[in-house]
């Protein structure tokens, strides 16, 4: 009976370790597929300054970069005016895995020249922040002031020194 317990315990431990390495490999592959495209985009970000969001979004799609989630911010934070978008390229599970393992998470802050209409609050709330084409249409005419790219300095460099 004790031998059976040891075999079961060993099997459970091996499956757990295998699952961890599988997830780690999966996240590494995802990170390595996203970041080179974002690094390339960061290098030419000024090209989109003053342009409408729709132009930048079309570029992301053409690069195969799929926005998964978004959130919004006010800068400075004491303003009621919403003028910053955060675009994320990971789903909740991937973000949690990255956070738990202290891995970098690639995302973009987009500072807008135009105020984002207050309706964005309800849209984000109703979709739990998951991106859909309604957001693309809603934000399409807003002009980009500047962008910051985060999480591109390597998978294990969670606390980056400065954005691109």
Each model region followed by its residue ranges:
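Residues within mature, well-folded domains
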Residues: 25-164
